[in-house]
Amino acid sequence: NFSSCGYVPKKNNKRANRIEWEHVVPAYVFGIFFSEWTVGHPKCVKKNGKKYKGRRCASKVNKEFKRMEADMYNLFPAIGEVNGLRSNYPMTIIEGEEREFGKCDVEIKRRKVEPREEVRGEIARTYMYMDSVYPGKGIISKKNRSMFEEWNRSDPVDEWECERARRIERIQGNIN
């Protein structure tokens, strides 16, 4: 229901009308650190004999990648169209306020994404969590570390974020 949030679709497509589970830290960001993503694996062969690599291969054969891809702390609901347009672009601050989606305050420009202020803390903490739980996978670049630290400070944890973490801990078994 777009009227409840002021969202205006950029295109009239099916994804604008559905909610998808989005990786805050895109699978691509950590996926490229796995050989199954970059070069493939002997088990990654289609029925026609053609080899494949990338996310599909890493998901099929690498347990650590599967754990990272399914980590519930990194999954958040998003409007499907925004999720698709966001792609695997990095988070940043984009100068100006060109709102392409009505009142939905997200900006996507030049292969970069600026989330609304109210969720920047959750995004920063998600990146920090993934970076600490899965070290050595390039989750946070040196360039972005200070931005995420600032986002963490300017948008503190709220009660819903704590409740969400408790629920995930019960299901997934680890604490954030």
For each predicted feature, which ranges?
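Domain-level detector of nuclease and nuclease-like folds
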Residues: 12-176
